[in-house]
Structure formats: C-alpha cells, structure tokens
C-alpha cells in the first residue's frame, strides 16, 4: 500500500513465450502493475482511466516477472525487481503509465540462447532499468534499510538473490 492507501499488485507474463507479447497490450493484465483502492475500485487518477482500449487499473506495463516491490521510504516511489530470462534481471522505479519494455527490449536471451523481441536493450518510449544483473542473481526480495545500527547504510537497497545465494547491498545515489 502506498501512503494514500492504494494497493499495488504485480502481474507477470507467466514466464511463457505464448503470453509474453501481451505485456505490451493495455487490454491485458499480463506483464503489468495495477493500482487499486482497498475496496477494489479504480483510483480516478490512474494513468489509463478513461482510455477506452486500456484497463483502467493498470499503473505500468511491460514488466516480465516481478519478484519484489517496495516503496522508497523518503520519496514514496514504487521500486521493483524482476527476473530476466537468461540474463537481464532488472531494478526499476515504477512511474504511472510507463512502459518498461518487456519483451521488446531486454538484457536477457532465451534459455535456448536465441534472441528475445528485437534483440535490443533500449528503445524510445520505453524506460530503461536503473540497474540490471547479467549474469542473473534471480532476485527474490528487497527492502530499503532504515535502521539505526548501520547508519552508513541508511537508504541503501538490499536484494536477495536465489541463483547467487547472496544478499546484495546497493548503495543508492538518489535514483541511481
């Protein structure tokens, strides 16, 4: 829940080549992050409210397989991490109405080694991740440090890694 009480829900692409292209379609929940009120209604200020060809609950789209999300303790911005395929795990700051590119752009490749999408990692109109891991760490959770014991870690982001069996600390400089 954000500071205004809205609930964010992430919807992946089911890790399926059959469904992945739907992450670019605003009439599908696949590959999206939705924002709703606690009673299930749609906030009036969601970016696609009133756009006839889009589901109004969609907050952002073009994500692959979100594994964790957290609100930045100072800015309230929604951050998320997602599994890439073979390479290209991502850390993103989610903006309303933004397209994060999956599967058109990715730093990863098919598990078979083939190209995904257009074989590019950036494109106009699509938001680049603020950080990506290749090889993958298979992120499994994240939190911003707000404790008192390690003052120099204040605001740092901690990410668990399944494949790396590691806890990764990212020292942030603003949104980087």
Regions found by a protein language model. Give the residues of each.
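Beta-propeller domain segments
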Residues: 4, 13-176
């Amino acid at each position: 829940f954000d500071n205004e009480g809205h609930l964010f829900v992430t919807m992946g692409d089911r890790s399926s080549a059959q469904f992945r292209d739907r992450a670019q379609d605003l009439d599908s929940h696949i590959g999206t992050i939705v924002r709703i009120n606690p009673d299930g209604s749609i906030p009036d200020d969601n970016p696609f409210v009133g756009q006839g060809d889009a589901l109004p609950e969609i907050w952002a789209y073009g994500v692959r397989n979100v594994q964790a999300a957290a609100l930045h303790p100072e800015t309230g911005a929604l951050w998320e991490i997602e599994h890439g395929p073979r390479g290209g795990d991502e850390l993103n700051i989610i903006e309303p109405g933004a397209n994060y590119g999956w599967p058109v752009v990715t730093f990863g490749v098919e598990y078979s080694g083939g190209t995904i999408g257009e074989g590019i990692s950036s494109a106009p109109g699509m938001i680049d991740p603020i950080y990506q891991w290749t090889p993958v760490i298979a992120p499994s959770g994240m939190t911003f440090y707000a404790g008192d014991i390690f003052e120099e870690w204040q605001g740092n982001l901690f990410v668990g890694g399944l494949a790396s069996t590691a806890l990764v600390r990212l020292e942030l400089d603003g949104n980087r």
